[in-house]
Amino acid sequence: MNRKIEDINKIIVKKPLKLDCGKTINNFPLAYETYGKLNANKDNAILVFHALTGDQFVTGTNPITNKEGWWVTAVGPGKAIDTDKYFVICANVIGGCMGSLGPKDTNPENNQPYGLDFPVITIKDMVKAQESLLEHLGVKKLLCATGGSMGGMQLLQFCATFPDKAFSAIPIACSSSHSAQNIALNELARQAIMADPVWDNGKYVSKNVQPKNGLAVARMVGHISYLSEKGMQEKFGRKLQEKADYEFSFNADFQVESYLRHQGYAFVERFDANSILYITRAMDYFDLSKQYNGGLVEAFKNQNTKFLVISFSSDWLYTTKENKDIVIALNASGADVSYSEIITDKGHDSFLLNEPEFLKTLKGFIDSMHEKFKNEKRI
């Protein structure tokens, strides 16, 4: 049975949060979910940062959509991140649409949905809000923090901003700043949304409608970038969609067309168009080096966190080189870092899929870090 957004777990963050744009928010909701139990020694907490279109429902069943959690392949009883053993925390980012403060919420100044009056947010703003959740849950230091894609960006920002908050960290398939190609793809998605007349300069929420066509196209753009060329060719090739020959029309003749349309229009039922604008903007603004006067090494100074950086060989959205650049900076800063490139043809989305080598690597690192963290806390 579906739950309503109003009924999900959330805290009200009362202390003011000064945003990078100069504005301040306070008394705002931050929605979250936890899995497993925090043990008596409080040495088993793992914070998961979600990606662009994710949410706090990491595993099990999402009570809003009735679909599987977005990382059910990796998180759950007996899985790589074992919820019988670890206490897993995940929050919906501010700017999102699954219960945390976002552009579809009511602006107290006029009792209308924020729309484009919502302040522009950054990855750093997201992370600072989530640190308040750890305070609420009584977690002073995490066993591990992890996340893929935008989740990995949040993780890097978290470690730079709060260098003593995590014993270990696993950034997955991410980058320390958005490339021109990343920005271009996000701009294409935003323009698709804004070109939909229903978008109406972000005011559609007050009319109880959604710019479905624009949002669906934005999602299609994303899905292309999440796959690899080889993986897409092997999965679809030029195969037709339930027909023997071309229709000589603009219907979905090819399986790949049908796939993109399905993914696009299924997405509009669970996500807010303005949230895509705000979150992709936060990703584009992310540049950890810029925050530290052009030096990524400076961002990671004074780190006691133990890092495992993971990339995927066929990921062209956040390439192996970009992930290796993070490793180089961590090494140069004196941080404890290891690196693993997973060989796969499944592209950027590999971290969400059942990739045995990836899951084995994830589990091995977390379990070994738990033993070290327990020993450290005994001293």
Predicted regions and their residues:
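Catalytic-loop region of hydrolases
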Residues: 1-48, 379
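Short alpha-helix in the alpha/beta-hydrolase fold that links the catalytic acid
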Residues: 291-296, 319-330
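Catalytic active-site module of serine/aspartate enzymes centered on a nucleophile-bearing elbow/loop
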Residues: 325, 331-379
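Conserved acidic catalytic loop of the alpha/beta-hydrolase fold
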Residues: 113, 117, 124-143, 157
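Short glycine-enriched nucleophile-adjacent loop
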Residues: 152-163, 169
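N-terminal cap/lid subdomain of alpha/beta-hydrolase-fold enzymes
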Residues: 33, 37-107
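Short beta-strand/loop motif that positions the catalytic acidic residue
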Residues: 303, 309-311
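Alpha/beta-hydrolase-fold enzymes
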Residues: 171-266
